């Protein structure tokens, strides 16, 4: 079982490979703020015991690698997500996967629904520090266009809601209609984002000291 010191080591290894802090957040299924905190702890060689202060992030790490490493398990999750999303529409003809980890889930979901597939790379993948306002996300030209399509948006984890909100807005700006979102785990307990309902297979709620 991993502890926070293990996550600090993982963040350091990912940073050494040249990943941005936004990409590290995506790999570890934590917020950008948590990813920055982990990298900073690694840079100072500080254990979590030495840095457990009121400034420490309040987050939950979700490790779904046991699912991700096996095609049959991914397919099963795709079936479950597709079943949940069908409650919102049977006429959707496109699934949009959020890069990186959301794409395998979106592929399995699209396969179960018999729809086309699009992918979106959020701006956080370019982020290291400072304001993200000057950065932008993009749809891959190697997959289907979202223009004039009714879409389901699929990701692995909702951490703050920022990435899935960005993707919903990007779909609309590109001429598509986001009908609903499907995620493996929701750490915020969001019922909808920007008017688009969210179906989560798991609701993850942090309970403990430091909660307001």
Swiss-Prot record:
GO terms for molecular function: DNA binding; orotate phosphoribosyltransferase activity. Pfam families: Pribosyltran. Disulfide bonds: none annotated. Contains an N-terminal DNA-binding winged helix-turn-helix domain and a C-terminal regulatory domain (or effector binding domain) resembling phosphoribosyltransferase (PRT) domain. It comes from Halobacterium salinarum (strain ATCC 700922 / JCM 11081 / NRC-1). Belongs to the purine/pyrimidine phosphoribosyltransferase family. GfcR subfamily. Keywords: DNA-binding, Transcription, Transcription regulation. DNA-binding transcriptional regulator that functions as a regulator of central sugar catabolic pathways. It comes from the Archaea. This is Transcriptional regulator GfcR. GO terms for biological process: pyrimidine nucleobase biosynthetic process; regulation of gene expression; UMP biosynthetic process.
């Amino acid at each position: 079982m991993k502890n926070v010191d293990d996550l600090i080591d993982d963040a350091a290894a990912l940073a050494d490979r040249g990943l941005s802090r936004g990409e590290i957040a995506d790999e570890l299924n934590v917020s950008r703020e948590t990813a920055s905190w982990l990298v900073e702890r690694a840079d100072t060689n500080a254990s979590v015991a030495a840095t457990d202060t009121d400034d420490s992030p309040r987050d939950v790490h979700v490790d779904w690698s046991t699912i991700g490493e096996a095609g049959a398990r991914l397919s099963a999750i795709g079936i479950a997500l597709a079943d949940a999303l069908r409650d919102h529409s049977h006429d959707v003809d496109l699934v949009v996967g959020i890069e990186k980890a959301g794409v395998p889930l979106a592929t399995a979901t699209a396969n179960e629904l018999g729809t086309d597939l699009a992918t979106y790379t959020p701006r956080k993948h370019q982020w290291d520090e400072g304001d993200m306002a000057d950065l932008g996300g993009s749809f891959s030209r190697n997959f289907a266009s979202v223009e004039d399509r009714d879409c389901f948006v699929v990701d692995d984890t909702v951490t703050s809601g920022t990435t899935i909100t960005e993707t919903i807005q990007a779909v609309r700006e590109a001429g598509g209609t986001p009908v609903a979102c499907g995620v493996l785990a929701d750490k915020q307990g969001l019922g909808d984002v920007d008017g688009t309902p969210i179906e989560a297979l798991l609701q993850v709620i942090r309970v403990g000291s430091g909660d307001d």
